[in-house]
């Protein structure tokens, strides 16, 4: 099955008996290990053979009996910050290297209930803190569009045989690279400031972040709880719609969904407040709507100096293609976009400093253990019950300090320190409170565009200011943070956003545009994304094979 084959076509082949679940799943495993085990380092861990065999057998039996579920036998990758029962969940960190949860996250549970086969847990930046998937404890993810050498030896970022390795983006880089490489049909990621959309752009796949609160966060290891959003990475928009339809459920057992998908569109011939099925809404729009029915906004504030020429040209080209087909395009202003990046890093790190305080070596995860000196003689002649409480206190403090110092990577420690500073008494008003005010202003900017005079339906922007950069490229930390400048605003406002790959840059790397819509108009966003991806000039992109797989 190639990248062009969507879930519905795979399911039909399985129902018709033209394809067996065993062949589908084991071919994916074979591809992952084709050159050497996990060659692109997309997965941290794969499902064990016994569990995999059991799931394959059960799925095939349901197909044979005509009782198959929607995702039966479909291999799905899951980012390694979603808890999965009896399956390591590491968050890409040494501190959780051997942590095995006793429960499934709601996202994993919903996938399993529909018969999906969780083929493995995908690699990521540690605790989702990064934009390149190079900061994790389990090594760097290689972008499948990298240029391989003749010997397929990836010991160095760039070697004498002409190999050039590019980052996969982050923090869901493993998920994006796995889908682009056809190692799984689709993958699950999390998006806090662009962590689904930016790697999707770098790897040339569809990345969809839904409205905040639609998909349950229960079992998603928190980075910044008010921003973290589960989402999907696929090769086409149809698969994104199908997965979202399964995952968008009010979580009755936990409080990590805040809203239900209701009719939020005044123009629809339905009663406001009526619950909707996102897949049905998407399919209905495909039948009865076209590009002429939408108003597209072009935010001039996204025209930043860091914008790559190829991406700028693609942005202009998409606008021209929409206008050629009768779509209405207007220029809009989001004036507080310039403040979104610093506000985000203050808010996200503040929440992270609190969320990550639980990793202390006491309750679960890695604990620092000092090496015992076998030759050390205990000269303490005091009675055993004569305990020095000060020594115990210092020992516990040392254990906390050394556990977190050795268990967390440099980027995570940097962000914890920044967040702790922002929440301190002397800095709270000057930093954290101001960042919250900026968040409100950014949200109001979007509200004015979507509900203002032009009634914009969809905003079109670049996804990232540049294509993927080289793995060994020396970059100032601020330059790295700027890679999220296009994606962060929609997280601050809780809006749905989608990255769609459309063509290759002059350096043969995927480039994309981002679409953003109003809250709870996720179905409209899916329709717009599908329509643009199927313009004649773009529809062949997903048939291209990434360089590293040729």
UniProtKB/Swiss-Prot annotation:
Query: Which InterPro entries did the record assign?
Result: Amidase, Amidase_CS, Amidase_dom, AS_sf, GatA
Which top-level enzyme class is recorded in the Swiss-Prot or TrEMBL entry? ligase
- In the UniProt entry, which residues are flagged as the active site? 79 (charge relay system), 171 (charge relay system), 195 (acyl-ester intermediate)
Q: Which GO terms describe its molecular function?
A: ATP binding; glutaminyl-tRNA synthase (glutamine-hydrolyzing) activity
Cite the entry's keywords alphabetically.
Answer: ATP-binding, Ligase, Mitochondrion, Nucleotide-binding, Protein biosynthesis
- Catalytic activity as recorded in UniProt: L-glutamyl-tRNA(Gln) + L-glutamine + ATP + H2O = L-glutaminyl-tRNA(Gln) + L-glutamate + ADP + phosphate + H(+)
Stated EC number for the protein is 6.3.5.7
Positions of the region Disordered?
371-390
A biological-process GO annotation: glutaminyl-tRNAGln biosynthesis via transamidation
* Cellular compartments annotated: Mitochondrion
Keyword Protein biosynthesis carried by entry: yes
Report any Pfam family annotated for this entry. Answer: Amidase
A GO cellular component entry from the record: mitochondrion
Return the HAMAP family for the record.
GatA
Task of the protein: Allows the formation of correctly charged Gln-tRNA(Gln) through the transamidation of misacylated Glu-tRNA(Gln) in the mitochondria. The reaction takes place in the presence of glutamine and ATP through an activated gamma-phospho-Glu-tRNA(Gln).
Q: Which family does it belong to?
A: Belongs to the amidase family. GatA subfamily.
Which proteins does it associate with, and in what oligomeric form?
Answer: Subunit of the heterotrimeric GatCAB amidotransferase (AdT) complex, composed of A, B and C subunits.
Name assigned to this protein? Glutamyl-tRNA(Gln) amidotransferase subunit A, mitochondrial
> Gene encoding this chain?
gatA
